[in-house]
Every structure is written in structure tokens, then in C-alpha cells.
Amino acid sequence: MEFSPPLQRATLIQRYKRFLADVITPDGRELTLHCPNTGAMTGCATPGDTVWYSTSDNTKRKYPHTWELTQSQSGAIICVNTLWANRLTKEAILNESISELSGYSSLKSEVKYGAERSRIDFMLQADSRPDCYIEVKSVTLAENEQGYFPDAVTERGQKHLRELMSVAAEGQRAVIFFAVLHSAITRFSPARHIDEKYAQLLSEAQQRGVEILAYKAELSAEGMALKKSLPVTL
């Protein structure tokens, strides 16, 4: 996926009210960006970081600029727009860049399923194969080269794991897919130190037949693509 038009660069002043961030451009202008990330954004929003943002041509938007990427002061590139996790995963599936998810003839998005009436991110189908249910999570929390999810307690994420276990019990294929959107991450684990219940459920889900995949994106201000499978340790 290529950014078109190209992203613009600025320096982060502060993120606040969860959805807003003030930046200063190279020519000295101060702008307020929309921040499309409701998480803690630990390590992704330090004042002084380089920010890459897009600009919408929708004149009705109060904040036409959207924060897309951070380049930390240590040099790591991080995609902070959580919407890209699903977009990049869909692109990779359609391009058959994810070997574990190749060979299907149909891809559907936002399909209702399960006893808790969730919506699965993607459902893959093919003749003579079980349906494949895929839940996507964006990974941006890093400690050294270790990636973690979640970055805050997530009851919604816990619900998704319960739903996937039910799918696997019914004989369908269930996959939790971690889209790693941080250039410094080389391996993935659940964030037991943040959400112990989620980590416990993820281990239980694997034991009950839910597949766990983690793929890392190549990230730049020019574009992004999921490319590399990462090791997962529970």
C-alpha cells in the first residue's frame, strides 16, 4: 500500500483528549491533527517525535489532518492509525502474502457471528474447506524488540477470544492475527503484565484450536505492507 498523496512531516508537541495532537511543521506552523487511536499509545507519542500525517480534501472535517505514523527519537517507525491493521491484513490476504491464509476464493468483512453477537474482521471461504474466521489486532507496544498486545486492559479483546474458541469448537477455522506495526519489534507475546486475563484466554484459545499468527509490516512514509511472520511466545 502506497500513501497517495504523500504524507507530510511534523514534530509532535503533545497528544491530548485521546483523539487530538498538536504538531509543528518544518516551516513553523502549528497544526492540530486527528489521532485515530484510542489506546494508551505507550512509546508512540513522545513530545519531540517525528509525526507523518495525511490531509483529507473533505472540507466538512473539523480536523482535516490525520496522524498516520510516528518516527520515534530512537528511529523506530510506528503506525498509530489503527484502521490500517485491517486494511493491510486484507491486502496481504488478497495478495496471498500470508501463506497460512492462502487458497481461499472468498473474503467477507464484518460478518456477525457468535453467541455474544460480535463482528468478525474477516471470513474466508472456499469449496471443501471449513470457513476461516479472522480477528485482527494492531500491535504497537514495544519493550526493546519485544512486541505486546494489548497496551491496556481490553474486555472487548477478551470477548473476541471467547467467540473464536466457540468457532473452533464448531469445527470451523479460527485465527487471531496480530498485525505488528512497529519497526523495532522482532517477536510477539501477550501483555500479561497489563491484562493477565487476556493472556490467560489467549493460551486457552490456542489449546482449544485457535491459531495465533503475528506478521510484521514494512513501514515507511511512502507506504506499508505486511511481510514477515514473527515468533509468538505465550
Swiss-Prot record:
Pfam families: SfsA (PF03749), SfsA_N (PF17746). One of its GO terms (molecular function) is DNA binding. Residues 201-220 bind DNA. Gene3D superfamilies: 2.40.50.580, 3.40.1350.60. Keywords: DNA-binding. InterPro entries: SfsA, SfsA_C, SfsA_N. Disulfide bonds: none annotated. CDD domains: SfsA-like_bacterial. It comes from the Bacteria. The keyword DNA-binding applies. Belongs to the SfsA family. PANTHER family: SUGAR FERMENTATION STIMULATION PROTEIN A (PTHR30545:SF2). Binds to DNA non-specifically. Could be a regulatory factor involved in maltose metabolism. NCBIfam families: sfsA (TIGR00230). This is Sugar fermentation stimulation protein A.
